[in-house]
Amino acid sequence: GDVGTNAVAIRGNAPQFTQWRLEGIEIPNPTHFADLAGLGGGFLSALSTQVIGNSDFYNGAFPAEYSNALSGVFDMHLRNGNNQKYEHAFQVGLMGIDLASEGPISKKRGSSYLVNYRFSTTSLASGNDINLKYQDLAFKLNFPTRKAGTFSIWGLGLIDRNKADVLERSEWETMGDRSSGYNKLDKLAGGLAHKYVLDENTYIRSSLSATYSKDRSLADLHTDDAIINVADIQNSRWNLVFNSYLNKKFSPRHTNRTGITITELKYDLDYKVSPYWGLNKPMEQISKGSGEST
């Protein structure tokens, strides 16, 4: 990657082949505007440093629990909120407003909450004419019990909007000057997790989670006489994931993890693109369909 993106290229692989995981499950790329770039790098992480806990990064030789990744794996976790006192944070930067809050739900039981919300300051400053707008929300609720283990509820969501307006006709020099477009990206992930400690070296963790992502892209080419639609792309994906494993630490150098992951996949896509941009040709159906798999 470079300083202008959130891309990570590993062993020459494109950033889109990196797997992102949160709270033990695979999630859509948690980066704003990630799917607008062909390489999948994105612009800004949707996970604020206010909420990130212990995380692992693998650039090869993945453990058996990781699949569906060609280059690397980011295995991230949300930290628990402070269960003793309330803390709040407010930050303003060039790219956005960051609001965070954490504290106890019940001091007696040790339960806590953590929530973080960000909103692009560029849209606040420029209203509806700004090209890039984004929002993201992340939270985690933690509920320890005396005998039944620890329950947690977590979630992550991001909303991206990108609008490219055509230049004034007097400024047209290239085909890009005569193009306009609109992109909308929505991503959600969340779940319920349970961890039960059997002894100081053994625990069982189970979770039921869901992820959702939807992309919509429109592009028009402006001529002296008309506006021609050259792209209309819609892509939606849903995943329902059940995961459970037993973790056993035999020694400081030997830990075994045995479990199962069941994923139900659903998709719905509709791709219409003009095959010859600039030649004023109508759009053609490139791909259309829906389905599911487990």
Segments (PLM) and residue ranges:
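Short acidic, glycine/proline-rich loop/turn micro-motifs
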Residues: 31-34, 124-128, 165-167, 217-224, ...
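Transmembrane beta-barrel architecture of outer-membrane proteins
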Residues: 5, 42, 52, 69-71, ...
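Extracytoplasmic loops and strand-loop junctions of Gram-negative outer membrane beta-barrel proteins
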Residues: 36-41, 57-58, 82-84, 122-125, ...
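Strand-connecting loop/turn motifs
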Residues: 17, 50, 83-85, 96, ...
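Structural signature of outer-membrane beta-barrel domains
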Residues: 15, 25-27, 79, 95, ...
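Face-selective signature of the C-terminal outer-membrane beta-barrel domain
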Residues: 142-160, 181-294
